[in-house]
From Swiss-Prot:
GO terms for cellular component: cytoplasm. GO terms for biological process: argininosuccinate metabolic process; L-arginine biosynthetic process; urea cycle. Belongs to the argininosuccinate synthase family. Type 1 subfamily. Pfam families: Arginosuc_syn_C, Arginosuc_synth. It is found in: Cytoplasm. It comes from Archaeoglobus fulgidus (strain ATCC 49558 / DSM 4304 / JCM 9628 / NBRC 100126 / VC-16). Keywords: Amino-acid biosynthesis, Arginine biosynthesis, ATP-binding, Cytoplasm, Ligase, Nucleotide-binding. It is an enzyme of class 6 (ligase). CDD domains: ASS (cd01999). This is Argininosuccinate synthase. Homotetramer. The gene is argG. The lineage of its organism: Archaea, Methanobacteriati, Methanobacteriota, Archaeoglobi, Archaeoglobales.
Length: 390
């Protein structure tokens, strides 16, 4: 019997390889690592471990597909309770690639290394079950702890980066880096500086601010500092620039799908800069009613992504609405980066619904006296209510 395992090269998925044979009776374990912008060293390490411990290994390049999904996220100002959805958006894509290999190999089942307390189990399994595969989840089904896994790996000669002193679970892709576990599970514990890799400490960031200019076309970032580049290169460059200035750290309490509250630590410099810039450009070109309704759509969109429900028909409908709003979201935005902050300082668009002449205090383009009639009726119902009951 064959099983295809979604494989990151980390502790959880690595111990799943022998467990799938020992506890579940599979003859062949095939590992699949999906490249969505992780560091090259991580991809190489996963390949080496997959080839060493599994019977067969695949590495699939899905960076372009992931960037396309990130463009949609930017247009949706994707954000769940302050989380920029990097891991959540990646999981269904990874699951689809695992399914492709499972079909190719004629596997009887697919597997993942997610725990029974997190969200990823749901994101993976929704896609796996959509394609009719039997799902194996050793970490959840065997009720494993990270300490048990570390000891099991040691006994089986499996080399893993996690230790009992630093039992962190780290997930990284082009959009974000997340760190959880260990002492970080105590919400009163201040995270040590060594958990961060993408971002400088804001206190130690450069004393001189830096301004970046981002060009958008129909809601999609297409140029950085007047240089056109592909999405992958642009996001990677902003991660480096923003990280240098300590931009994009999030330490938050997050409401998981199962109802548990979890402490999460994220790094996402490019995401912070791009969403800040994109939202500001929308404020310039979209009408008040478009902006108001889009906020509701964005909340629903983010929740569907967070819950792993990107195959829900509502998700397609929300995307269609968002795409319609982006037809005029073209222009440029300048963002100042300084010691952890990303602040918009200038913006311009040929579709701006802003008139300097009309809004200026120093012009007579609008006869101010015309506002008198509007002012007489503004708040009328509230005034009538107060007269009746006071």
């Amino acid at each position: 019997m064959k099983v295809v395992l979604s494989y990151s090269g980390g502790l959880d998925t690595t111990v799943c390889i022998p467990l799938l044979k020992e506890k579940y009776g599979f003859d062949e374990v095939i590992t699949v690592t999906v490249d969505i912008g992780q560091p090259e060293a991580d991809i190489k390490q996963a390949e080496e471990r997959g080839k060493k411990y599994a019977d067969k290994h695949y590495t699939i390049d899905a960076k372009k597909e992931f960037v396309d999904s990130l463009f949609m996220l930017i247009k949706a100002n994707g954000n769940y309770e302050g989380y920029v959805l990097g891991t959540a958006l990646a999981r269904p894509l990874i699951a689809e690639k695992v399914v492709e290999v499972a079909k190719k190999e004629g596997a009887e089942a697919v597997a993942h290394g997610c725990t029974g307390k997190g969200n990823d189990q749901l994101r993976f399994e929704n896609i796996f079950r959509q394609h009719g595969f039997k799902v194996i989840a050793p970490v959840r089904e065997l009720n494993l702890t990270r300490e048990w896994e570390i000891e099991y790996a040691r006994q089986h000669g499996i080399e893993v980066p996690a230790t009992k002193e630093k039992p962190y679970s780290i997930d990284e892709n082009l959009w974000s880096r997340s760190v959880e576990g260990g002492k970080l599970e105590d919400p009163s514990f201040e995270p040590p500086e060594d958990i961060y890799e993408w971002t400088a400490s804001p206190e130690k960031a450069p004393d001189k601010p830096e301004i970046v200019k981002i060009d958008f076309e129909k809601g999609v970032p297409v140029a950085l500092n007047d240089e056109r580049m592909g999405g992958f290169e642009l996001i990677k460059a902003l991660n480096e620039i923003g990280g240098k200035h300590g931009v994009g750290r999030t330490d938050m309490i997050e409401d998981r799908v199962l109802g548990l509250k979890a402490r999460e630590n994220y790094e996402h410099p490019a995401a912070t800069i791009l969403i800040t810039a994109h939202r500001d450009l929308e404020n310039l070109v979209l009408s008040r009613r478009e902006l108001k309704f889009k906020k509701f759509v964005e909340e629903e969109w983010a929740e569907l992504v967070y819950y792993g429900l990107v195959n829900d028909p509502l998700f397609d409908a929300l995307n269609a609405f968002i795409d319609k709003t982006q037809e005029r979201v073209t222009g440029w935005v300048k963002v100042k980066l300084y010691k952890g902050s990303a602040v918009v300082v200038a913006r311009n668009s040929p579709y701006a619904l802003y008139s300097e002449e009309l809004v200026s205090f120093d012009t007579e383009s609008i006869d101010q006296r015309l506002a008198e009639g509007f002012a007489a009726f503004h708040g009328l119902q509230g005034r009538l209510f107060r007269r009746l009951f006071q």
